[in-house]
Curated annotation (Swiss-Prot):
Lineage: Eukaryota, Fungi, Dikarya, Ascomycota, Taphrinomycotina
Location(s) in or outside the cell: Endoplasmic reticulum membrane
Species name: Schizosaccharomyces pombe (strain 972 / ATCC 24843) (Fission yeast)
Residue ranges that the UniProt entry lists as topological domain Lumenal: 1-22, 85-98, 143-174
Gene behind the chain: eos1
Coiled coil: none
Protein name: N-glycosylation protein eos1
Function comment: Involved in N-glycosylation.
GO biological process, one term: cellular response to oxidative stress
Keyword presence, Translocase: no
């Protein structure tokens, strides 16, 4: 946990590799990356509040809160990946502007997705956040493919490299660790909660229908 916390509040590794260590710039990078998961964390607390005040079907807001955490994590790794690409292609100022613009887009995407899928009914928060997390997982896979040449050539930015260094490929190990595993863990616990609900209240879904 301490390692992940240090990752959030420390200078991003791409900036360190490029020798960017100005305090104000580092503060902007840290702030923009932290803002990436604020919307999902807000919905996490909202789901936990719904679980606290609910008389039954507490598993729905609880599992929804779990998926919001998955979305928050994916939002962070997406912002970190865009930071890597933009630092290579743009100067510091445009990169910071793009990062904050990305947070605005992320906030709008999450808000509109939840509103469109749930139509104001909190009972649909779980499928909404599952859909959001799956979309973000697909976006991370595309981003990993796009930034794959940058990752290989980053330490040798000023040197000439062979054309093979600029070929796009997918790092399946990285995708599995950073995208598939979080979604898989959340899916497992969602399935367990659903089975528990069916076992304890076998007629609950018939009644709710």
């Amino acid at each position: 946990m301490k390692q992940y916390l240090n990752t959030v509040i420390s200078n991003p590794r791409p900036a360190q590799a490029l020798g960017i260590n100005q305090p104000f710039v580092v503060f902007c990078f840290i702030t923009s990356r932290a803002l990436s998961f604020v919307p999902a964390i807000y919905w996490c607390f909202k789901c936990l509040h719904l679980a606290f005040v609910a008389d039954k079907f507490k598993w729905l807001p609880l599992t929804s809160a779990l998926w919001t955490l998955v979305s928050a994590y994916l939002s962070f790794v997406l912002a970190n990946g865009f930071l890597l690409k933009w630092l290579i292609h743009y100067s510091i100022g445009p990169t910071i502007i793009r990062l904050f613009s990305l947070n605005v887009i992320n906030f709008s995407f999450l808000s509109l997705s939840v509103s469109f899928i749930t139509h104001g009914d909190n009972a649909y928060l779980l499928p909404a956040w599952i859909a959001i997390s799956c979309f973000q997982t697909a976006a991370y896979i595309v981003q990993d493919w796009i930034t794959s040449p940058i990752i290989r050539t980053l330490p040798f930015r000023s040197s000439s490299s062979s054309s093979s260094n600029y070929r796009h490929n997918l790092d399946f190990l990285e995708i599995t660790v950073f995208a598939v595993v979080p979604v898989g863990i959340a899916s497992f616990f969602t399935m367990v909660m659903l089975i528990w609900q069916l076992y304890k209240y076998p007629d609950s879904f018939l009644v709710s229908a």
